[in-house]
Amino acid sequence: MAEERHFILGAAGHVDHGKTALITALTGTHTDRLKEERERGISIELGFAELDLGGGVRLGVVDMPGHEKFVKQMVSGAGGVDLAFLVVAADESVMPQTVEHLEILDSLGTSGGIVVMTKIDMVDEDFLGVATEETRELVEGTFLEGKPIIPVSAHTGEGLDVLREALLQEALSLPARREEGAFRLPVDRVFTLPGAGVVVTGTCWSGAVKDGDRLVVQPSGDKVRVRE
């Protein structure tokens, strides 16, 4: 049996370009959990899902808010990703937060990634071609230059299998995550689930953790035990 490899995938792009719908189509998990997010149809906080690509590769997916008001949350989620997909809606092409998110990911040293052209069911071939060319010009000189631009529709499912395969190949090209060293996880969110207790989410920067491990929460110094 092949050894499992785990990576963190960040989903970036302009507001309402279909990041959350795409993640839901890929994973079956709707990452908008807040009532306000569902009512407004936009992501406000970081969302999380898991994607099993097969071949021993699993991705922890971070859905990063695309609205300009929530760029702080986006930066928080982008800090520990191994690879990213930049989502561009075919019916709108490149928009301000498309550019901003790309610049943030590039400045953070993100190495792996692909571009996803969403909502292709809403445009004709000519419009799709223009949006694709504008996106290709945008990523020149960044970590996404020369990376695949995958056209998909979360609504019809078109292109999702191609996207999964592209993500798998991109992940396999990356070095395995280092699990040595102290476990460090900057906490993005804390909430309580009935029957489970306190749940924290974030992006692991180093080390590994398992059920029963004891950790120290900083800066308070509180000692906690990990439960699955």
Which residues are covered by each model-predicted region?
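Solvent-exposed alpha-helical segments within well-ordered globular domains of core cellular machineries
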Residues: 24, 72, 76, 86, ...
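Amphipathic alpha-helical transducer elements in NTP-driven molecular machines
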Residues: 4-5, 44-45, 68-71, 78, ...
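Conserved Switch II/interswitch segment of TRAFAC-class P-loop GTPases
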Residues: 57-59, 64-69, 79-130
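Conserved catalytic-core segments of large NTP-driven translation/proteostasis enzymes
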Residues: 137-228
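Conserved G1/Walker A P-loop phosphate-binding module
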Residues: 1-64
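Signal for well-folded cores of large energy- and translation-related assemblies
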Residues: 27, 31, 35, 39, ...
